[in-house]
Amino acid sequence: MCASVTESLPKFPELKTRDLQGQQGPIRSLGWNLSGSRLASSSSSGSVLVWNSDRLDFKFTTELGNRGYGLVEQLVWDPTHSDRLMAVYAGKMIRFWDFRSAKPIAEIESNYENIYATWSPSGNYCCASSRDDMLSFIDARERRIMETFQQPCETNECCWSFSEDLFFMTTGLGTVQIMEWPSLKRVYDIKAHNSNCFCIEFSPDNRHLAIGGADAITSLWDPQELICERSITRMDYPIRTLSFSYDSRYLASGSEDRYVDIADTKTGDQIWKIPTNGPLNKVAWHPTKHILAYAVSEPNSSGLKIFGL
């Protein structure tokens, strides 16, 4: 049994990186759908492409809408449906897409310049957050804004707990604020870092909560006890993006350091390091395989790459 488990683990030195070419401009956001059959990427050129994971070639991509819809700040797939995703636009619009449709299936006009979006585990709710730290909570079934909530401090990435009764928000105070959902009653602050907290991610097995900060540290927490189990301190620049592998065994992180760090979640030790030619914008593990998509800011390229093929 132990041998079969070992054999199933990736042999990192043998894994290759592939450039996905054809999309113009640096990649701003990317993500895999529920099944891992598609990878969506948005770029500074205004294009949103959906890549076929079985045929990772530009000629097999599908463009959602057209660039007349504006610049996508963030996109996120419905966690319960492989064809649906949500995107927040620089022009204060929030759009819901179905991959099979040429036009948005719903549009919501927001009063705020939203820059981040997340979806609840049940797929029933979404949240969009703005440059002005305004949170817009959306009923994804009726596709309407339920409530807006003004944060009194800088707010960056946010997410729901697996049970969907709590909502977590990273802040510029070095804390993660926790509110009850849907009452939005503030119940606890995690004193996570000495400076701004930028990113947050639960592991798929719900045994780890990762928080990335401006102090170049990634902290790993027990989400039940809210106790810090270990810190990863290898990087020199603020942590901007985090992603757990599907089996919760590995944590990928990225910053302005010119590499992707892949850590063992049980020890925090570096398992592998992927060199890059520029700062990292986003990392995203495939939902069922040890394949990592990541976006790098590099000249004359979108910087979209796949590791693990």
UniProtKB/Swiss-Prot annotation:
Entry GO terms, CC: THO complex part of transcription export complex
Swiss-Prot/TrEMBL WD repeat ranges: 22-61, 65-107, 109-148, 192-231, 234-273, 275-309
Keywords on record: Nucleus, Repeat, WD repeat
Protein name: THO complex subunit Tho3
Function: Component of the TREX complex, which operates in coupling transcription elongation to mRNA export.
Taxonomic source organism: Schizosaccharomyces pombe (strain 972 / ATCC 24843)
Any one GO biological process: poly(A)+ mRNA export from nucleus
Subcellular location: Nucleus
PROSITE patterns found in the cross-reference section: WD_REPEATS_2, WD_REPEATS_REGION
SMART domains referenced in this protein's UniProt entry, alphabetically: WD40 (SM00320)
Principal subcellular localisation of the protein: nucleus
Pfam families: Beta-prop_THOC3
Binding partners and assembly: Component of the transcription/export (TREX) complex, which is at least is formed of SUB2, TEX1 and YRA1 and the THO complex composed of HPR1, MFT1, THO2 and THP1.
Gene: THO3
